[in-house]
Amino acid sequence: MKTTEYVAEILNELHNSAAYISNEEADQLADHILSSHQIFTAGAGRSGLMAKSFAMRLMHMGFNAHIVGEILTPPLAEGDLVIIGSGSGETKSLIHTAAKAKSLHGIVAALTINPESSIGKQADLIIRMPGSPKDQSNGSYKTIQPMGSLFEQTLLLFYDAVILKLMEKKGLDSETMFTHHANLE
């Protein structure tokens, strides 16, 4: 297959994955973000990169957004929101993050393929995501892509869609958000 044909197939998979995401769950996440004093994002590996990109856009919107594990991350306070992206919902470090957030009376939102996972069971809000686990032999969702690629890509697109929803709710545009962009580059 040609590279451009692979691109087309990946885009087709991403297009189809949108139908598996609940607008109601997405709206609940947006509402939690709007009502939270601080928002923390977490993920491991490529899912962690997606979490960082989401925190960055939230910061561009003026939200008090942080990335779990960074050296400048402040303490979580009661009622703060922790958004965890984990395909399997069984990543050990993220299970610990969810448990710690709950012990501090934070609100945990889990974006996962597996709502019945250890992280899902601790979550106050679950956003069910399409995709295949890294070990695709146990997955019911078929993809041509390796390991968790479809989940990770869908996660990024979902985060960007939530940003658009928040922009709409707050009446923001890209130009306004750019005033929060780094300027020491």
Curated annotation (Swiss-Prot):
Pathway: One-carbon metabolism; formaldehyde assimilation via RuMP pathway; D-fructose 6-phosphate from D-ribulose 5-phosphate and formaldehyde: step 2/2. CDD domains: SIS_PHI. The active site is at 152 (proton acceptor). One of its GO terms (biological process) is formaldehyde assimilation via ribulose monophosphate cycle. Keywords: Carbohydrate metabolism, Detoxification, Isomerase. PANTHER family: 3-HEXULOSE-6-PHOSPHATE ISOMERASE. Homotetramer. Catalyzes the isomerization between 3-hexulose 6-phosphate and fructose 6-phosphate. Together with HxlA, may act as a formaldehyde detoxification system. Belongs to the SIS family. PHI subfamily. This is 3-hexulose-6-phosphate isomerase. It comes from Bacillus subtilis (strain 168).
